[in-house]
Amino acid sequence: MGSSRLRVFDPHLERKDSAAALSDRELPLPTFDVPYFKYIDEEDEDDEWSSRSQSSTEDDSVDSLLSDRYVVVSGTPEKILEHLLNDLHLEEVQDKETETLLDDFLLTYTVFMTTDDLCQALLRHYSAKKYQGKEENSDVPRRKRKVLHLVSQWIALYKDWLPEDEHSKMFLKTIYRNVLDDVYEYPILEKELKEFQKILGMHRRHTVDEYSPQKKNKALFHQFSLKENWLQHRGTVTETEEIFCHVYITEHSYVSVKAKVSSIAQEILKVVAEKIQYAEEDLALVAITFSGEKHELQPNDLVISKSLEASGRIYVYRKDLADTLNPFAENEESQQRSMRILGMNTWDLALELMNFDWSLFNSIHEQELIYFTFSRQGSGEHTANLSLLLQRCNEVQLWVATEILLCSQLGKRVQLVKKFIKIAAHCKAQRNLNSFFAIVMGLNTASVSRLSQTWEKIPGKFKKLFSELESLTDPSLNHKAYRDAFKKMKPPKIPFMPLLLKDVTFIHEGNKTFLDNLVNFEKLHMIADTVRTLRHCRTNQFGDLSPKEHQELKSYVNHLYVIDSQQALFELSHRIEPRV
């Protein structure tokens, strides 16, 4: 068989009641207990059947032998696209099998072809005079409409990425001109023409105003950590976009500030001053590279343009201690900052954690998981939002440990642990499994779990509650406890993203992407099916559930104070509870 062949599972082809739909020759019903293959060569003339295993006896029910799911197993990119176009219906709603195949293809096509390749292939299918030399003239507009339907679905899925791709913009203009030329010969294309006029209109508005800064799936935040090469972003950064800015207070601790890219130093300093409870006029910001060079930021300096280096950090320092590299020591005064949390309502605090996590989770494009999995670098220009949610999970874990270990008084520390157990329970109740896992892992951090004096004073009912919460994080049986509990939760809900990525990675590493020079589309279907978990979780929207009077609480959650050094955390742990 040639390299252009396509291999598919088609359980419907062998049903007795659909025999008339087959070719002229009768094919016997195979007695297979697993789905079987149909090979389609380039001319689509010969059929060859095979199976991975055979059953010794034939089941009485055809339905019990054959899956209802229609699955493309493998093929060249061109043949997969051709098969997809053949199967598309022009009705408003596709059948389930075709809809799944279309969604699988659109979610994963970048694995085996570039966007430019896809655009060129679609143009060829649209402009072909005759399809494989056997198309009736009456079928031409139908084929064109199928191509346009696929394009519209592609645009709907990638509406926030396509305007940044030059190949896509050129393709949309070209196919629009083709439809404009064809509509006189085929008036039935008028509906598609109007749709493309709307699409091109939206793209023009995107060029002018980048849509709304609040639009879904746009990169709402960008990592701004000098420790990790500062800024990671997708496409051109605009002044309306926001960043995660780490402002270091000591060598191992920082305040995480959410601010616009266009923010000046004075605006960021105001947030930091409020967080660390110092007078703004007594503080200043300085950019310090790892080579030791310092650059003091003036009030009106743009933070990014003035301090964007390959490596380094932004520090806040007291003006009266300008010559000190780390002007804020972890002294008794800094330790007392942890006491603020004891006065906060645990449900409201969990609610703010959920709001923040949802803003990140709701901004993740489904294909970010594909890029993250297939890119050896892990995070890049197409995974900004996903990387930020993963970073947030890590920060919440560090925040829990930081708050507990900065509390030197045993009684207060016991209250803090109880507080975090309650917050974790509320996160579970609010269906925010990302922060739930992070808090439980923070309480189980070695530097916290070793605090025997603290844990001994935790009341029995809290220990029991924490044990129940811990059981959901049990990794045994492939995280069965978590999966069962999460499956029962109704959307909207936030999954534990590292585990979802683990699932996609497991499929990727356990299956070859190409088999005999053909795209292993069965693997891509499994990946797409897992990625669709995001879509299910976002079936409904949380919205902003924060009362206006929670602004202080919201500011606290948005700008967490964390110590990011495990060594520093262990030193604090041994300081408050020395080894006996």
UniProtKB/Swiss-Prot annotation:
It is found in: Nucleus. Widely expressed with highest levels in brain. InterPro entries: Ras-like_GEF, Ras-like_Gua-exchang_fac_N, Ras_G-nucl-exch_fac_CS, Ras_GEF_dom_sf, RASGEF_cat_dom, RASGEF_cat_dom_sf, Ubiquitin-like_domsf. Residues 345-579 form the Ras-GEF domain. Disulfide bonds: none annotated. GO terms for biological process: nervous system development; Ras protein signal transduction; small GTPase-mediated signal transduction. GO terms for cellular component: nuclear body; nucleoplasm; nucleus; plasma membrane. Its main location: nucleus. One of its GO terms (molecular function) is guanyl-nucleotide exchange factor activity. Residues 68-201 form the N-terminal Ras-GEF domain. It comes from the Eukaryota. The keyword Transcription does not apply. Keywords: Guanine-nucleotide releasing factor, Nucleus. PROSITE patterns: RASGEF (PS00720), RASGEF_CAT (PS50009), RASGEF_NTER (PS50212). Pfam families: RasGEF, RasGEF_N. Guanine nucleotide exchange factor (GEF) for RAP1A, RAP2A and MRAS/M-Ras-GTP. Its association with MRAS inhibits Rap1 activation. PANTHER family: GUANINE NUCLEOTIDE EXCHANGE FACTOR, RAP GUANINE NUCLEOTIDE EXCHANGE FACTOR 5. This is Rap guanine nucleotide exchange factor 5. The lineage of its organism: Eukaryota, Metazoa, Chordata, Craniata, Vertebrata.
